[in-house]
């Protein structure tokens, strides 16, 4: 049975909002890591609004990377999160995704 909105000839509301996504990644310091982290973002057609990387863990053996996206579809942010978790060498990914006003 069709919903009352469809029966009344009104189109259902589309999910047209965008989100901001913040990703915090830790991994062993490796020369190819940054390019492996940026690649899935580029493949999804997004451009990071910020990328910051620093060597941590006292001896510099660990890399901490902050990656931000703005104005992307919620599904794009979710796919980036999944892709970052699948990058070889990544130990941890923390993601914060919030709806833009």
Predicted regions and their residues:
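A conserved regulatory-domain signal marking ACT and ACT-like small-molecule sensing domains
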Residues: 2-101
